[in-house]
Amino acid sequence: MNLHQPLHVLPGVGPKSAEKYAKLGIENLQDLLLYFPFRYEDFKTKQVLELEDGEKAVLSGQVVTPASVQYYGFKRNRLRFSLKQGEVVFAVNFFNQPYLADKIELGATLAVFGKWDRAKASLTGMKVLAQVEDDLQPVYRLAQGISQASLVKVIKTAFDQGLDLLIEENLPQSLLDKYKLMSRCQAVRAMHFPKYLAEYKQALRRIKFEELFYFQMQLQMLKSENRVQGSGLVLNWSQEKVTAVKVSLPFALTQAQEKSLQEILTDMKSDHHMNRLLQGDVGSGKTVVAGLAMFAAVTAGYQAALMVPTEILAEQHFESLQNLFPNLKLALLTGSLKAAEKREVLETIAKGEADLIIGTHALIQDGVEYARLGLIIIDEQHRFGVGQRRILREKGDNPDVLMMTATPIPRTLAITAFGDMDVSIIDQMPAGRKPIVTRWIKHEQLPQVLTWLEGEIQKGSQVYVISPLIEESEALDLKNAIALSEELTTHFAGKAEVALLHGRMKSDEKDQIMQDFKERKTDILVSTTVIEVGVNVPNATVMIIMDADRFGLSQLHQLRGRVGRGDKQSYAVLVANPKTDSGKDRMRIMTETTNGFVLAEEDLKMRGSGEIFGTRQSGLPEFQVADIIEDFPILEEARKVASYISSIEAWQEDPEWRMIALHLEKKEHLD
């Protein structure tokens, strides 16, 4: 057996089950072993008096009141009984699980896993434990048709078959010894089934180091390629033409835009290869700066390409650049073009008849030839792998590269995370833009907000509603969103059109729903997914985020940035009843500032204390386990050792480091 065999070779996994696992990205045995839990439930029995409010824990005690089931509403019920631990008596509630009543005998000793509510001195039960279980139990993200129990069973089967012994080591022994790291095989086993918390932490550190080290090695290789390729292109752009276009704009650039533009234009005119990151707050005007840089490249006799992650963004940028530069020839290249249209576009690019080329990853496919590519701009660069970025760069004769991200990143972090890139920052908003008014409300205040919304919609405004996020289950995400969408449809019947957007839809279906929203065919858009960064709907003035405390500051700021794109006053409403102090702090900070750089610093401080938010949509590279902010010290160590290895002449041939070179070749192939 080898790890590249399909999943259905495992006993108990048939072809139909394998299809369900494929939705999680698990297609072969290696994918299964490397599909790590995103958290663990601690099943060590705790004392009731030591629990924090909202903490999940196992409490054991003697059953001192009989279990009673109370029914209310449609198919809803509550099972209630009391446990005594020492001298403390507390209530236990199970919702919609009446069948558990048979398991609860008066006078018996019982262990229950649940969530503690200090104010009510009660535990909301999640699981009755028949016997003492392992202290730490993995919790995996799921897809429809897969339960925690079935996934754990399949992973256990893989380990029982000894498949973990086939996992190849990808770090030399010298690094394992120097940084006191577990072997890869040990770490993978301990990530799934740790014997104790310290073992899990060691495994996590090993996997994080591996991810960050190889990321830094890829950056070092890009850096050395730049050096080997020699000097960059010299783009002698026309000062006169660039100034004329700037003057013709219907607005003046902010000082921050002007400074960033000059840094970019200076790089383009120099003989060194530009490799720059342009970061700016949501709505700070990066697109105009990027557009002027592209125009400058054209005045120097070159083509400029802009690569974005989605078709709807490509179309949006195409329209805005067409309006900015009506005299330039633009080409739009996306995956959905029909064969004849695609041939025509490819021909205009190859012949040099297109000045500006805007597109998705279709820009890097085989068969796309550029006549004279001088500048590449990659928007939301964290959405593209290092390999994809390299391919686009190889399409020209070492063209200048500008990467953009819509999320402010603290400078020290940006410099380490993006290796050798120069960083330009737009930290000012265009004049006249009204700050978004942000309010935090409790769930019970939602009816008043819906009444207020009716008035806003009557005035012609459109609304985004983000459905609660439940990390464990995509199926629950969808169920909640459908329920929310139906409730809003009923509430606004005859007054507003409601549409639903979710992650299971095909990309063309998502694009159509967004297009309908842009064209005002719908008034309210309910979404489970974070609305695409940069999607511009000027008429959308209200963003409502349900269970907002489940998002990190950067995600909340990104969501808020979907509104406030026109000249009307815009609003963000955070609906949350946070149980933790950090959740309350996030809500408070969001209502106090709309400055993304202030929020980025706060996010850094809060994460430093061990709070974990996702890096999705954060503008930073994404990893399976590592988090660039949370794991900054590991990132620094990884950067130092990657820098040292890369500085050794012909390190790829050195027996000590050969393993790294081979693994990088495999990674590049996968990217």
Swiss-Prot record:
Residues 44-134 are annotated as: Wedge domain. The keyword DNA repair applies. Transmembrane segments: none annotated. GO terms for biological process: DNA recombination; DNA repair. Residues 445-610 form the Helicase C-terminal domain. The keyword DNA damage applies. Residues 267-426 form the Helicase ATP-binding domain. Disruption phenotype: Increased sensitivity to UV light and MMS (methyl methane sulphonate), a six- to seven-fold reduction in DNA recombination during transformation. PROSITE patterns: HELICASE_ATP_BIND_1, HELICASE_CTER. Its EC number is 5.6.2.4. A motif (DEAH box) lies at residues 379-382. It comes from the Bacteria. GO terms for molecular function: ATP binding; ATP hydrolysis activity; DNA binding; DNA helicase activity. It catalyses: Couples ATP hydrolysis with the unwinding of duplex DNA by translocating in the 3'-5' direction; ATP + H2O = ADP + phosphate + H(+). It holds the Pfam family RecG_wedge. SMART domains: DEXDc, HELICc. Keywords: ATP-binding, DNA damage, DNA recombination, DNA repair, DNA-binding, Helicase, Hydrolase, Isomerase, Nucleotide-binding. ATP binds at G280, D281, V282, G283, S284, G285, K286, T287. Belongs to the helicase family. RecG subfamily. Monomer. The wedge domain within the N-terminus inserts into the replication fork junction, where the lagging and leading strand split. Binds and unwinds Holliday junction (HJ) and partial replication fork DNA. Unwinds R-loops. Plays a critical role in recombination and DNA repair. Helps process Holliday junction intermediates to mature products by catalyzing branch migration. Has replication fork regression activity, unwinds stalled or blocked replication forks to make a HJ that can be resolved. Has a DNA unwinding activity characteristic of a DNA helicase with 3'-5' polarity. Complements a recG deletion mutation in E.coli, restoring UV resistance and poor growth in the presence of mitomycin C. This is ATP-dependent DNA helicase RecG. It comes from Streptococcus pneumoniae serotype 4 (strain ATCC BAA-334 / TIGR4). The gene is recG.
